[in-house]
Amino acid sequence: MNLQEEIKKRRTFAIISHPDAGKTTITEQLLYFGGEIREAGTVKGKKTGTFAKSDWMDIEKQRGISVTSSVMQFDYDGKRVNILDTPGHEDFSEDTYRTLMAVDAAVMVVDSAKGIEAQTKKLFEVVKHRGIPVFTFMNKLDRDGREPLDLLQELEEVLGIASYPMNWPIGMGKAFEGLYDLYNQRLELYKGDERFASLEDGDKLFGSNPFYEQVKEDIELLNEAGNEFSEEAILAGDLTPVFFGSALTNFGVQTFLETFLKFAPEPHGHKKTDGEIVDPYDKDFSGFVFKIQANMDPRHRDRIAFVRIVSGEFERGMSVNLPRTGKTAKLSNVTQFMAESRENVTNAVAGDIIGVYDTGTYQVGDTLTVGKNKFEFEPLPTFTPEIFMKVSAKNVMKQKSFHKGIEQLVQEGAIQLYTNYQTGEYMLGAVGQLQFEVFKHRMEGEYNAEVVMTPMGKKTVRWISPDDLDERMSSSRNILAKDRFDQPVFLFENDFALRWFADKYPDVKLEEKM
């Protein structure tokens, strides 16, 4: 098979949702259909001891939430599928936002009892901004939930996207009978030995079931007043196909997967800093680092840089340019993933995600190119932290482990490090409280370094030019520090302190990052 045909087979997407909507469960079921796991591990592992395949980090297993983005790959129906399972918890939005830069489509999982929730809305905005297609899975039909027409109406009003139901539930909860498949024009049965039946058999199967009568009325209404199906509108991100089902009971998931793969886009190009788009079918390899993960194998204290291949083909042992540093690197130890298990890869193509063993060479956002190509892709989004803590080693004898742990975890980008210019104290900044909990847990569990963390509260962060640096500007209300790139930065106590400083030093330009 030639390079172009290989690239055309790729389907790379992220799963987004509010916490507990069933995102990890549907990921499990997709892997089950892809033949990667023998049984779909349920996320209820907190009690049973069976943990979800995609939640590989110790703290994720304990808490039943995804706090890092897992990458998983399988083949199905002639396609090579790359799933990125993103953190649903809002404190990890930075990791999630970056992950969404590395995919060509998104699957939005919604709890049918709760509808569109806060984190779903936030993540949808990012996806919408990127202009990539969104496929919606209305989950948990095995429980009582809201009326399907209400769910569609809310989806359209809250998210501002048109919807098209690919199937329609017949009852829900204990009265759930199956799905009326509008796209495939058949019935999918929840009970009994037969999985499918023709629409003509509906009246015979369900007799005078009031739920089935309601379904027929709803579908008549949708045919008259609903949106038209349009593959063009789906690919443009203007129309979301909506699938109903139950990930926990594995109902409707296979139909979703098969239909999704028909309409999900091939790998797309990516924009360079000069605005030009790199075509995935360019023969020259290029890619970008969207995530760095330390200790995927705690026994080896390793670090993996996750790379989305944008164009061409990766071959083991190839040399790549790193335009940020002007140096080259050899890609010899490269893996592909099934959550915590991994295998060496000899070649991969545009659309694939590879993991490059990293000894400190790479940073999140780095571009990799070959030959004379030394361009850079557009920068990935970064977030200014809002809450801060001082951090120090509890045991002075563990300073080496403490420094190694901080260095590696900070390079992942979920937490940011600042050093007080005058005292040398370490200060950590994060978007939310959970990031500090995860940091503390991982320092102790992965680096055997207990830490003391002292809250500093919220701070307003502004960078200044090194030319304007004067240590006398620092005070308790505006702490002068340096970030991990040694750039000078002020941590202001509040907006009042910021305005006071700006009035006192009008010639000092204060810069705010995203």
UniProtKB/Swiss-Prot annotation:
Entry annotated with the keyword Protein biosynthesis: yes
Superkingdom: Bacteria
UniProt: GTP binding residues: 17-24, 85-89, 139-142
Pfam families (UniProt xref): EF-G_D2 (PF22042), GTP_EFTU (PF00009), RF3_C (PF16658)
PROSITE patterns in alphabetical order: G_TR_1 (PS00301), G_TR_2 (PS51722)
Keywords from the named record: Cytoplasm, GTP-binding, Nucleotide-binding, Protein biosynthesis
CDD domains, per the entry: RF3
Segments crossing the lipid bilayer: none
GO BP term (any one): regulation of translational termination
Residue ranges of coiled coil: none
Record-annotated tr-type G domain positions: 8-268
Example of a GO MF term: translation release factor activity, codon nonspecific
Database matches in InterPro entries: EF-G-like_DII (IPR053905), EFG_III/V (IPR035647), G_TR_CS (IPR031157), P-loop_NTPase (IPR027417), PrfC (IPR004548), RF3_C (IPR032090), RF3_dom_3_sf (IPR038467), RF3_GTP-bd (IPR041732)
Keyword Protein biosynthesis set for record: yes
Annotated PANTHER family: PEPTIDE CHAIN RELEASE FACTOR RF3 (PTHR43556:SF2)
Family the entry assigns: Belongs to the TRAFAC class translation factor GTPase superfamily. Classic translation factor GTPase family. PrfC subfamily.
Primary role: Increases the formation of ribosomal termination complexes and stimulates activities of RF-1 and RF-2. It binds guanine nucleotides and has strong preference for UGA stop codons. It may interact directly with the ribosome. The stimulation of RF-1 and RF-2 is significantly reduced by GTP and GDP, but not by GMP.
Protein's UniProt name: Peptide chain release factor 3
Organismal lineage: Bacteria, Bacillati, Bacillota, Bacilli, Lactobacillales
Gene name in the database record: prfC
